């Protein structure tokens, strides 16, 4: 499976040359759990994991060898089976990245179906995902200062009346808790599986991962062994991985990118993984020490979503030796200003390879060519054996035609990374097509050389009087301003145009600029006049998912609240407004005290011109 004499990747011609050999001749076994065991056995005494405490580069380090990791994983697999958890049962995993989580993921892949869940969700959201998945066990971070995971998990499972057992993991630099996972697992053999485990097939479900981080409505995706094995192969090819690599795990394991490229793929390829902090890249101490981590541990590839890289670009290494870094690394998740890419290459010598992917494709479908041209604003070319189409779709969701070169349309993928669909079959309609294609919901275009440019989510289009405005057109322009660190554009409701563009920005620390100056900058850099934002809202911190994507549904709610609080000012009775997203759009609830039918009619007269759903509660 693992090879290190990688061919060059300079153009689509090199991709096509790789495809001259059928994938089935390159990959002959599709059992990803077995690949993990093989990775541990490459160099058993090599360090698999180094963990430090909350970004403290000078503090203690917990180290596991690959032999340690394999032993813990097999013990956990035996523990799960001994407690009646079967191959098709889900194990909900709720907590930040610690060494035990790697063993848990690996062990539950051997015995069951791991389901890493966003540990920052509140109790109702956790409960919903646990119930949806049918999890037969929960493993969560126990009581830990600075984290509310345990409290939320307790509330999430209390209505299950003990039907789902809960085990704990702990801060590796703190005490163990009751029902400690590793303690319970230590009572079981670690040198062999105590149950028969058939070899997983290409279409066998390996694990669950939830999507929906930018919408607030997660869907559970069935990730297949075939998709995981292909992702290992494709990532290793695209980034020329070797067992000598040392990588940082600072992206959450509940995100498909953190789970794979900075998680399980690293283990399967025999990399040493550094866990700098349980808070990951959100830990300011870790980010302040970033270049010291590179020096101390000999990091070979930078890790970082664009938001992290923008901070690192402003804080380059000073005396640190970063010669261990290889000449390229990958990032993704959201648009990044070309100036940040240029600055990172200037201070590190490493090129930033942009990628495009999604959970439903088991991570990336495209990646910049490590030996080829990088085109600003693009996310590389398709990886081998993956088909990327840009199509026009009818209002009914049918594919009408393929788009022309540089024409924007819906991105549709097909290939060995496509997931097995959503756990809830009702969500599959119009997304996972009968021919095996995936309708991504993203808009993009392909140039004549196969480079993809992602414009944004179709649902995020700003529709101004029939004019479709791509948010990225606004965001890319604002990111060219030296004062702007992050930007996100959404539509605000308008009685005449339907929507008008508004931008939310986060400035670099210490930067200053007025709204008027930034509006003028936007007008000068946005080629379409209707796309120039009407307002710019400055935020101390843009709301982001754990991997740096703007949570646009929150910004859409904020923009609507700002509009309708002004629109409803003429109401003569006391009133309150609630705005939420529902059914793919906005839903307003206006609560009025007193006034009877007259108050209801007054609300109708104020809101009827807007293309939003609303309800009126009169008390």
Predicted regions span which residues?
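Structural core segment of the AMP-binding/adenylate-forming
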Residues: 1-2, 82, 113-183, 613-618
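Conserved AMP-binding/adenylate-forming core of the ANL superfamily
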Residues: 28, 45-98, 102, 122-127, ...
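Conserved pre-ATP/AMP-binding loop-to-beta segment of ANL
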Residues: 44-47, 173-176, 186-210, 217, ...
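Conserved AMP-binding A3 loop
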Residues: 63-67, 206-230
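AMP-binding/adenylate-forming catalytic core of the ANL superfamily
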Residues: 121-131, 138-141, 302, 415, ...
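Adenylate-forming
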Residues: 140-152, 276-280, 290, 297-342, ...
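Conserved AMP-binding/adenylation subdomain of ANL enzymes
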Residues: 229-246, 254-300, 309, 314
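Conserved AMP-binding/adenylate-forming
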Residues: 276, 329-355, 359-452, 458-461, ...
């Amino acid at each position: 499976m693992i090879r290190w004499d990688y061919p060059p990747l300079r153009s689509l011609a090199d991709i096509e040359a790789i495809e001259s050999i059928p994938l089935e001749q390159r990959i002959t076994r599709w059992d990803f759990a077995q690949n993990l065991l093989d990775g541990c056995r490459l160099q058993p005494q090599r360090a698999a994991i180094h963990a430090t405490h909350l970004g403290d580069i000078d503090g203690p380090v917990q180290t596991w060898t690959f032999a340690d990791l394999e032993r813990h994983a097999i013990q956990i697999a035996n523990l799960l089976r001994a407690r009646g958890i079967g191959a098709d049962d889900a194990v909900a995993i709720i907590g930040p990245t610690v060494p035990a989580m790697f063993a848990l993921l690996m062990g539950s892949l051997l015995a069951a179906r791991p389901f890493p869940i966003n540990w920052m969700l509140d109790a109702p959201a956790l409960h919903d995902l646990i119930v949806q998945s049918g999890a037969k066990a929960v493993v969560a971070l126990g009581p830990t200062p600075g984290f509310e995971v345990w409290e939320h998990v307790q509330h999430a499972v209390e209505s299950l009346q003990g039907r789902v057992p809960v085990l704990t993991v702990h801060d590796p630099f703190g005490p163990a808790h009751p029902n400690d996972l590793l303690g319970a697992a230590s009572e079981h053999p670690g040198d062999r599986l105590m149950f028969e485990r058939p070899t997983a097939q290409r279409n066998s479900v390996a694990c669950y991962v939830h999507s929906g981080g930018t919408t607030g409505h997660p869907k559970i995706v069935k990730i297949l062994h075939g998709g995981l094995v292909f992702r290992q192969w494709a990532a290793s090819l695209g980034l020329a991985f070797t067992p000598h690599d040392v990588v940082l795990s600072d992206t959450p394991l509940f995100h498909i990118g953190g789970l794979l490229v900075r998680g399980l793929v690293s283990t399967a390829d025999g990399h040493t993984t550094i866990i700098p902090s349980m808070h990951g890249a959100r830990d300011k101490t870790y980010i302040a020490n970033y270049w010291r981590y590179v020096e101390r541990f000999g990091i070979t590839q930078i890790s970082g979503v664009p938001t992290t890289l923008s901070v690192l670009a402003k804080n380059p290494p000073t005396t640190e030796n970063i010669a261990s870094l290889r000449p390229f690394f990958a990032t993704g998740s959201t648009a990044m200003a070309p100036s940040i890419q240029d600055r990172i290459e200037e201070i590190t010598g490493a090129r930033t390879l942009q990628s495009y992917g999604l959970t439903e494709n088991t991570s990336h479908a495209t990646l910049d060519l490590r030996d080829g041209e990088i085109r600003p604003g693009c996310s590389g070319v398709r990886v081998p054996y993956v088909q990327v189409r840009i199509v026009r779709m009818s209002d009914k969701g049918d594919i009408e035609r393929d788009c022309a070169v540089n024409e924007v349309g819906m991105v549709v993928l097909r290939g060995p990374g496509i997931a097995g669909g959503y756990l809830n079959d009702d969500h599959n309609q119009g997304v996972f097509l009968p021919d095996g294609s995936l309708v991504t919901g993203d808009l993009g275009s392909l140039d004549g050389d196969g480079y993809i440019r992602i414009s944004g989510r179709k649902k995020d289009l700003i529709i101004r009087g029939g004019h479709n405005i791509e948010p990225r057109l606004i965001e890319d322009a604002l990111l060219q301003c030296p004062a702007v660190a992050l930007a996100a554009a959404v539509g605000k409701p308008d009685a005449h145009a339907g929507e008008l563009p508004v931008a939310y920005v986060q400035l670099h620390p210490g930067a200053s600029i007025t709204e008027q100056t930034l509006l003028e900058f936007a007008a000068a850099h946005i080629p379409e006049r209707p796309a120039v934002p009407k307002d710019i809202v400055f935020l101390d911190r843009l709301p982001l998912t754990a991997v740096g994507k703007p949570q646009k549904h929150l910004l859409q709610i904020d923009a609507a609240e700002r509009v309708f609080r002004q629109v409803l000012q003429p109401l003569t009775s006391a009133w309150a407004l609630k705005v939420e997203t529902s059914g793919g759009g906005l839903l307003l609830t206006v609560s009025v005290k007193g006034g009877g039918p007259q108050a209801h009619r007054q609300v109708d007269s104020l809101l009827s011109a807007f293309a939003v759903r609303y309800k009126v509660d009169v008390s």
